[in-house]
Amino acid sequence: MQASELRFAPPSADKSALEEGRLFTPRFDANGLITAVVTDAGDGTLLMVAHMNAEALAKTLETGIAHYWSRSRSSLWKKGETSGNLQHVESISTDCDQDAVLLKVRVGGEGATCHTGRRSCFYRNVKVEDGRPILTENG
């Protein structure tokens, strides 16, 4: 995979510029990552939460295909590359202080986002039963 040429300027110390300005200056954390929340562009279903480093974010912006940083593998990850369930990005938004991004995507292939084969990684609800937290299948 070819390295990206897109570079991000450091975040402004001026809060107004960060919150109201036109320059996208993502605030990566101490590990060089930004949180990426991913939803279905059609119906808004929450599909997954992942992380991006500068290269993954740049590749996503340049190609229109979602790329993430795998913390477990310490490597760039083109979502759906092996399964065929590529995430085609329709829009990217950032929050007020630019430390998280929201990707609205259309999933190709069979439409699965989760490695378990499900559409969403959020397929279980957390509840309390008999004083213990338990998981139940949702939907």
Swiss-Prot record:
GO MF terms held by the record: magnesium ion binding; phosphoribosyl-AMP cyclohydrolase activity; zinc ion binding
InterPro entries referenced in this protein's UniProt entry, alphabetically: PRA-CH, PRib_AMP_CycHydrolase_dom, PRib_AMP_CycHydrolase_sf
Keywords associated with the record: Amino-acid biosynthesis, Cytoplasm, Histidine biosynthesis, Hydrolase, Magnesium, Metal-binding, Zinc
Binding site for Mg(2+): D95, D97, D99
Comment on bound cofactor: Binds 1 Mg(2+) ion per subunit. Binds 1 zinc ion per subunit.
Cofactor needs: Mg(2+); Zn(2+)
A Pfam family annotated for this UniProt entry: PRA-CH
EC number: 3.5.4.19
Subunit details: Homodimer.
Xref: HAMAP family: HisI (MF_01021)
UniProt family annotation: Belongs to the PRA-CH family.
Protein name: Phosphoribosyl-AMP cyclohydrolase
Protein species of origin: Chelativorans sp. (strain BNC1)
Gene name of this polypeptide: hisI
